[in-house]
Amino acid sequence: MRGMNIDGDNMILGRMANEVAQYLLAGQDVTIVNAEKVIITGNKENIFKRFKHRTDLADRANPTHGPFFPKTPARIVRRTIRGMLPWRKPSGRAAYRRLRVFEGVPETMEGVEFTKIENADGARLGTHKTLRVDQLSRYLRGE
């Protein structure tokens, strides 16, 4: 695959999303694997509360009208990156189309070499409070 291939294992979500958005706007194709292993920093209860509030937003008259927020790990990561792109401009939408996010590693990418974003590496946090995206996803889906 052409472009950049990123392993999301132990990457900080916001920092990774910022870097990926810059790559996308520069015209590169970006593929992220292991989206479920991306981490979010902060107090677990506050993170749950913030994301649950987002997913509970709906039109009271007709809840099928949205807004819609993702509940699966790959979609949570993808939506976070979308928030860092100029979504209402054609350049932002074109950049968003160049993004692929997967849970785990797809069979077609088994032998591919993945890069790590140094600025977003979660190993530098030490014992800081963190939450993995798969834990957040299980909470949002009620599992």
Segments the model singles out, each with a brief description of its role:
Residues 1-143:
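Ribosome-associated RNA-binding proteins
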